[in-house]
Regions:
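Phosphate/dinucleotide-binding and metal-coordinating scaffold of catalytic cores
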Residues: 1-244
Length: 244
């Protein structure tokens, strides 16, 4: 796959959710370095064209600590990001009729892939608040795999988190590279964004999770709101591998 294929922009005025939900999907190529089958695709809806990332269910490798259906967790991550207003996950939808069957379809983030969380944290202080928002998301979602390379800056200057399939486990599994804010008070804006989840989960998210995962998510929100600070990794072991 050429670099040109990775960077072709979407057409002007394309609504991401609309084209992802109803566009025709055509595989462009397989994404390198992915543990599961992950494809760059072209999505066409009338005169509109966009790039997206397609993760079919049939391309998932079995995991001992997660059930099958990681593509649904990719969708759930976007739903959580959207309903809370944290807006750290690119638009992602469930498609039942992709080229390789059912799977998730996520808006492709055009980015400088040489830049990732570690470099961005050092060079882009203006992104630190967005990193805090992503940290809150990862805590609530119980993200087990927030690698540095999963943090990308799009053309709009927004920080996006990709590869969110390993989220929402009932057992505490948080592994992330975002620990620099440990011990800091969490801004009221961020706490207020997730606080409503303590009492009620939107149907669009609850439908993607098991009952014990819903209970655990609400407990994480309650703990976070009660403590009001970013957690500290006292062990130094709660990092994903590889780091990038």
């Amino acid at each position: 796959m050429s670099s040109d294929e990775l960077t072709q922009p979407a057409g002007e005025h394309v609504d991401p959710l609309t084209i992802l939900q109803r566009g025709t999907i055509e595989i462009v190529g397989r994404m390198p370095w992915s543990s599961n089958a992950t494809f760059l695709v072209s999505v066409v809806d009338g005169d509109d064209t966009a790039r997206a990332i397609y993760k079919p269910a049939r391309g998932e490798r079995p995991l001992w600590d997660f059930p099958s259906g990681l593509f649904k967790r990719e969708v759930g991550a976007y739903v959580l990001s959207a309903v809370t207003g944290l807006n750290v996950i690119p638009p992602t939808v469930l498609r039942s009729e992709g080229p390789l069957g059912e799977g998730s379809l996520q808006w492709f983030v055009e980015a400088d892939f040489a830049q990732h969380y570690f470099t961005l944290y050092e060079q882009r202080e203006d992104l630190h608040d967005q990193m805090r928002a992503m940290a809150v998301f990862d805590i609530v979602a119980n993200n087990t795999d927030r690698k540095s390379g999963h943090c990308l800056v799009g053309p709009d200057g927004r920080l996006w988190g990709i590869d969110n399939g390993l989220c929402f486990a009932a057992e505490s599994k948080l592994r992330t590279v975002i620990w620099e804010f440990g011990g800091e008070p969490i801004a009221d804006e961020l706490l207020n964004a997730v606080r409503p989840l303590r009492d009620d989960l939107p149907v669009t998210l609850a439908a993607l999770l098991d009952a014990d995962e819903i209970d655990a998510l609400q407990e994480r929100v309650d703990d976070l709101v009660t403590q009001g600070t970013f957690p500290i990794d006292a062990t130094g072991r709660r990092y994903p591998w590889p780091l990038v």
